[in-house]
Amino acid sequence: VQSAPKSLFPVWQCGSASDGLVTLGCVTRDLASADGLSFIWKDASGSALTDVVQYPAVQATGGYTSVSHVRVKASDWNGNKKFTCEVKNGLGSKDASLQKPVERELHASLLLTTPTQTEIDNGTATFVCLATPFSPKSHTFKWTLEKTDISNKVKENIVSQNKGNFTAISVLELSASEWTSSTSPVKCEFQQKNHNVFKEASYGNPEFPKVYLLAPPESSGESVTLTCYVKDFYPKEVAVSWLVNDKQVEEVVGYEQNTTAVIDRNNLFSVYSQLIIKTADWNSGSVFSCLVYHESIKDCVRHISRSIAKDSKTPTLVNLTLTNPQSCSCSTYVCIWSTEIFHYEMEMDDDNMANTALTFVFLFLITLFYSIGVTVFKVK
């Protein structure tokens, strides 16, 4: 039995065609008959549109289905103008509005990396600004130095997409002197339609990291936590890794390593790295080492390490280097630091960095007061 249209589904084209037009469509279904069926399209002013196509109805399960489409200017569609589709027969009609949906804007997080000292020594300074994730795709990178736009010195811009979100990278290249002689920071600004975010980087002399390895408090649980505190270094790029009995932690099942984001304190940086280990391994006397890699450490030194074991009564070895390459101008040092073993209890609060930092200071002062001696051997 013939009846008025019961349903109408609007659809539209993603993007626009090369001719600057967008296709809008309407679908009606479950009709008892397609006799006398017609579509009418109107713009926001109510005027009828003429570039209309109506396809022959197709019979399917549940009744007939019919489709109509119209082409409109992309500028009108992108300008959020509203269009109306109406389907009718002799028994009634149904209409639906079509308007471009407001795009959800996902605001990006920004990361800015600075040149290494090696690159600066070679006369160049490269900055990489990473924005991720964000949407829609439209964005702008703006670089400034001493309030002057230097975006013309961008070497490369890269954009990638993953599951509807975007990642963008902008690479800026300056001469080393532009970077080191400037009293103002290099600024990378990432601009979206309704949101801007920026990061700045100022030049500073490399600062050698101080490294402290904190033993766990006594625990009756199945696991304990070692903490490596790396502080007062510059620049901010640093890598921390762990060894257990001279094996990389990644090769040992059951250990978990976590490192915090770098903390900025007056343009000097700090980081905490924690290693969660089995209590049985700690009680067995296994030796655990925290290794810190930073560009302020000369190539012939490569890293700083701190080692600890629960029951060790022997001096703790602070290993600054293993070899002395012929091309390296610095001397090799091995420092053996003997300290008394002392026990303490402390509750770690992961959410309170200030208390943790004070604990490290306390540990450091105790170590100074109870230090037995320091012997330094210089290997020519």
Curated annotation (Swiss-Prot):
Tissue expression remark: Isoform 1 and isoform 2 are expressed in leukocytes.
InterPro entries listed in its UniProt record: Ig-like_dom (IPR007110), Ig-like_dom_sf (IPR036179), Ig-like_fold (IPR013783), Ig/MHC_CS (IPR003006), Ig_C1-set (IPR003597), Immune_Resp_Modulators (IPR050380)
GO CC annotation: extracellular region; plasma membrane
Glycosylation sites: 122, 165, 258, 319
GO molecular function: immunoglobulin receptor binding
Cystine pairs: 26-85, 129-188, 228-290
Keyword Ribonucleoprotein: no
Transmembrane segments: 357-377
Region (CH1): 5-103
Region (CH2) residue spans: 108-204
Membrane-side (Cytoplasmic) residue stretches: 378-380
Alphabetical keyword list: Cell membrane, Disulfide bond, Glycoprotein, Immunoglobulin domain, Membrane, Secreted, Transmembrane, Transmembrane helix
Region entry CH3, spans: 209-309
Note: During differentiation, B-lymphocytes switch from expression of membrane-bound IgM to secretion of IgM. The mu chains of membrane and secreted IgM differ in their C-terminal segments.
PANTHER family tied to this protein: TAPASIN
Protein known as: Ig mu chain C region membrane-bound form
High-level lineage: Eukaryota, Metazoa, Chordata, Craniata, Vertebrata
